[in-house]
Amino acid sequence: MTVKTRFAPSPTGYLHVGGARTALYSWLYAKSQGGEFVLRIEDTDLERNSQEAVDAILEGMQWLGLEWNEGPYFQTQRFDRYNEMVDKLLAEDKAYKCYASKELLDEVRAEQEANKEMPRYDAEHPKIKAANEAAKDGDPCVIRFRNPKEGSVVFEDQIRGRIEISNSQMDDLIIRRTDGSPTYNFCVVVDDWDMGITHVIRGEDHINNTPRQINIYEALGAPVPTFAHCAMILGDDGAKLSKRHGAVSVMQYRDMGYLPVALNNYLVRLGWSHGDQEIFSQEEMINLFSLNAISKSASAFNTDKLLWLNNHYIKTSDPEYVAEHLQWHLDQKGIKTENGPAITDVIKLVGERCNTLVELADQIGYFYQDFDAFDADAAKKHLRGVAKQPLEVALAKVEALTEWTTENLHQVIADVCTELEIGMGKIGMPLRVAVTGGGQSPSVDAVMQLIGKERVVARIKMALAFIAEREANA
């Protein structure tokens, strides 16, 4: 048997953290078993669907690297198939027409609640029975699935263990509306059957749907897949995850400067574990992933942990990979990397200091863009009269360099200190402000080497002009 999983979001909003984790688990399980992963868009809610949401889901999946083997399939393109299966159940008396109006059903529900009964559809209720018997062909009706009245549905959830639901707790589900459109629970079953889905991995909010769907699988003569229901994700305060906890769309994490590999690593650990290991390569995730290692308990979303992982991956990933994802942020800032050193060299030098790609993009502009003003606080502190001579000596020495290497630039700074009998801080900080425009950067000799001789010379001259103007206005 080839394992086949699916991710089946509804296009009523963006791909959020919970959905992304479900997609990741489904993708990982398929990969770990040498199987296939299907993407299906469950767009039967015609009033709430949007193309914008479809695009956002596809973009989020692609950004996370969760490529699908089949799809995306759209349920709205399969209505003929669903109706064929509804008609099959009608012909076999496993479904029936119900003519009870919404108003009548509301009235019956109110009676049940008044009698302290569980509100549910009851085909044998005298009022509902009378409405169905009085109906004529052509009157508006829904189609209901004839749920078994006896026994119970039992299934072995791969995360939660044995689950049993009595059929007496389930009413006859509507499988086709009065407008002729099929309903969610029915479409899902037909899709999973037609697409050969063997394992359904989804959120625990679907547990109540599962016994209903199992009865429909069996009525259709379809194989019942294996189910695994994941616990919800909570905020770090124990409340259901919401926007105030940082529960934003996947692409907003892109916008905030997270790497897909970091978000995937974080999401896989929100419920699944392998000993105490925290860092997992994609290959390790695939090789180690199993459904029975997913916890039944809810997981708490911790932004600090995600940030720590992101910093780890910025520091340790192939600079080419970081550069690929940094490019979007550079484009937002109008930074063109053809105007300076190789971006991979800059990432190697600066990346370790950054928790996000936004921080990284903010810190590397001076490698590629000239500036016409220094950071006010840094200039006030370090571009003073006392820095004039050290900068002048440094300028002469860098202009005279024939080999522009980090080692030679380091020696220039050391020679300035020796020649003027000053400490490193007397030249290092003024030089840093001069060549970067600010007071923070990696080692200034390495920064100068990447910026290049022409720019370094021009910027030291600009700093000297700034000092001269400052002294003139003092």
UniProtKB/Swiss-Prot annotation:
<dbReference type="InterPro" id="IPR014729">
    <property type="entry name" value="Rossmann-like_a/b/a_fold"/>
</dbReference>
<dbReference type="InterPro" id="IPR004527">
    <property type="entry name" value="Glu-tRNA-ligase_bac/mito"/>
</dbReference>
<keyword id="KW-0547">Nucleotide-binding</keyword>
<dbReference type="InterPro" id="IPR045462">
    <property type="entry name" value="aa-tRNA-synth_I_cd-bd"/>
</dbReference>
<dbReference type="InterPro" id="IPR049940">
    <property type="entry name" value="GluQ/Sye"/>
</dbReference>
<comment type="similarity">
    <text>Belongs to the class-I aminoacyl-tRNA synthetase family. Glutamate--tRNA ligase type 1 subfamily.</text>
</comment>
<feature type="short sequence motif" description="'HIGH' region">
    <location>
        <begin position="9"/>
        <end position="19"/>
    </location>
</feature>
<dbReference type="GO" id="GO:0008270">
    <property type="term" value="F:zinc ion binding"/>
</dbReference>
<dbReference type="GO" id="GO:0005829">
    <property type="term" value="C:cytosol"/>
</dbReference>
<keyword id="KW-0648">Protein biosynthesis</keyword>
<dbReference type="InterPro" id="IPR001412">
    <property type="entry name" value="aa-tRNA-synth_I_CS"/>
</dbReference>
<dbReference type="InterPro" id="IPR020058">
    <property type="entry name" value="Glu/Gln-tRNA-synth_Ib_cat-dom"/>
</dbReference>
<dbReference type="GO" id="GO:0006424">
    <property type="term" value="P:glutamyl-tRNA aminoacylation"/>
</dbReference>
<dbReference type="Pfam" id="PF00749">
    <property type="entry name" value="tRNA-synt_1c"/>
</dbReference>
<dbReference type="InterPro" id="IPR008925">
    <property type="entry name" value="aa_tRNA-synth_I_cd-bd_sf"/>
</dbReference>
<feature type="short sequence motif" description="'KMSKS' region">
    <location>
        <begin position="240"/>
        <end position="244"/>
    </location>
</feature>
<dbReference type="InterPro" id="IPR020751">
    <property type="entry name" value="aa-tRNA-synth_I_codon-bd_sub2"/>
</dbReference>
<dbReference type="GO" id="GO:0004818">
    <property type="term" value="F:glutamate-tRNA ligase activity"/>
</dbReference>
<feature type="binding site">
    <location>
        <position position="243"/>
    </location>
    <ligand>
        <name>ATP</name>
    </ligand>
</feature>
<dbReference type="InterPro" id="IPR000924">
    <property type="entry name" value="Glu/Gln-tRNA-synth"/>
</dbReference>
<comment type="function">
    <text>Catalyzes the attachment of glutamate to tRNA(Glu) in a two-step reaction: glutamate is first activated by ATP to form Glu-AMP and then transferred to the acceptor end of tRNA(Glu).</text>
</comment>
<protein>
    <recommendedName>
        <fullName>Glutamate--tRNA ligase</fullName>
        <ecNumber>6.1.1.17</ecNumber>
    </recommendedName>
</protein>
<comment type="subunit">
    <text>Monomer.</text>
</comment>
<keyword id="KW-0030">Aminoacyl-tRNA synthetase</keyword>
<dbReference type="GO" id="GO:0005524">
    <property type="term" value="F:ATP binding"/>
</dbReference>
<dbReference type="InterPro" id="IPR033910">
    <property type="entry name" value="GluRS_core"/>
</dbReference>
<dbReference type="GO" id="GO:0000049">
    <property type="term" value="F:tRNA binding"/>
</dbReference>
<keyword id="KW-0067">ATP-binding</keyword>
<dbReference type="Pfam" id="PF19269">
    <property type="entry name" value="Anticodon_2"/>
</dbReference>
<keyword id="KW-0436">Ligase</keyword>
<keyword id="KW-0963">Cytoplasm</keyword>
